[in-house]
Curated annotation (Swiss-Prot):
The organism of origin for this protein: Xenopus laevis
GO CC terms in record: actin cytoskeleton; cytoplasm; nuclear matrix
Residue ranges annotated as motif Nuclear localization signal: 30-34
Cell location: Nucleus matrix; Cytoplasm, Cytoskeleton
Family: Belongs to the actin-binding proteins ADF family.
GO molecular function: actin filament binding
Residue ranges annotated for the ADF-H domain, each copy included: 4-153
Summary of the function given for this chain in its UniProt record: Controls reversibly actin polymerization and depolymerization in a pH-sensitive manner. It has the ability to bind G- and F-actin in a 1:1 ratio of cofilin to actin. It is the major component of intranuclear and cytoplasmic actin rods.
Biological processes per GO annotation: actin filament depolymerization; actin filament fragmentation; actin filament severing
Protein name listed in UniProt: Cofilin-2
Keyword line: Actin-binding, Cytoplasm, Cytoskeleton, Nucleus
Pfam family, one: Cofilin_ADF
Name of the encoding gene: cfl2
Keyword Cell wall biogenesis/degradation carried by entry: no
Length: 167
């Protein structure tokens, strides 16, 4: 069921910037987004970038020690969001980076919000071409353990996520 909600051009721009990893200057790399949240506009007519809810690559190691945990802490406990997370992980064979599309719909979000976000998910997914990993999360218990994301990325072949070994 389509909701009629549109995707703001800035959302597509952010996705394309995160998706394309071109060689850049150290300053450009620092400004690159590691994670970002998207929400509905106040009038519920379009999906927009939630400006205050993002992690820049340049913040890692300075303001942000653990990008995954910081991303989880950005999620509101009482409302839905869409998110993009640029996961850096290691398998037994190689290092990899993949974008993960996350649909956050916590159990205690208002029913109306869950319905609008669920029915608008296809609109944003269609704009995010080439996403390999999609994850619907319904509560902190589903997302707080980095092993759960590692399972989504490749199961038991993932040995570390964001430089942290998996047990």
């Amino acid at each position: 069921m389509a909701s009629g909600v549109t995707v703001n051009d800035e959302v597509i721009k952010v996705f394309n910037e995160m998706k394309v990893r071109k060689s850049s200057t150290p300053e450009e790399i620092k400004k690159r987004k590691k994670a970002v949240l998207f929400c509905l506009s106040p009038d519920k007519k379009e999906i927009i970038v939630e400006e205050t809810k993002q992690i820049l690559v340049g913040d890692i190691g300075e303001a942000v020690q653990d990008p995954y945990r910081t991303f989880v802490n950005l999620l509101p406990l009482d409302d839905c969001r869409y998110g993009l997370y640029d996961a850096t992980y290691e398998t037994k064979e190689s290092k990899k980076e993949d974008l993960v599309f996350i649909f956050w719909a916590p159990d205690n979000a208002p029913l109306k919000s869950k319905m609008i976000y669920a029915s608008s998910k296809d609109a944003i997914k269609k704009k995010f071409t080439g996403i390999k990993h999609e994850w619907q999360v319904n509560g902190l218990d589903d997302i707080k353990d980095r092993c759960t994301l590692a399972d989504k990325l490749g199961g038991n072949v993932v040995v570390s996520l964001e430089g942290v070994p998996l047990k």
